[in-house]
């Protein structure tokens, strides 16, 4: 990476990237839970008295907290830190695990659907990857001279 900031980044760009990261993270949760559910032959919430929307609520709360952490990561990067903040990466990973388990315990889920659930454990690397991908894209935008990626038909070489 270059020594100083090469390009200014608007608040709109950061918010757009943050929103895209949250959407990708939610899609990764759906995909990983679907594959895990097919492989294990079970659902994330199997307790009959607990409604399934509590799982959606738990993931929604965790995504909201991820958004706050990503905003803090962006502020750190814009202030000149050129490496991901390890506390934010670890906070996101353990935070999603804690949120899922606390929502599950408040809803009355047993330990095998909260603390020891593979569905809860797989959330941790997904949240860590989301923070790192957000950092990579934003750092590339701020600290490099590289243009935005383009599809082959968008390339400028053939037009001139």
Positions of predicted regions on the chain:
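Core segments of alpha-helical transmembrane spans in multipass integral membrane proteins
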Residues: 53-72, 93
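Hydrophobic alpha-helical transmembrane segments
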Residues: 15-19, 57, 86-90, 121-125
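Cytoplasmic membrane-interface segments at the C-terminal ends of transmembrane helices
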Residues: 2-14, 65-89, 108-112, 131-159
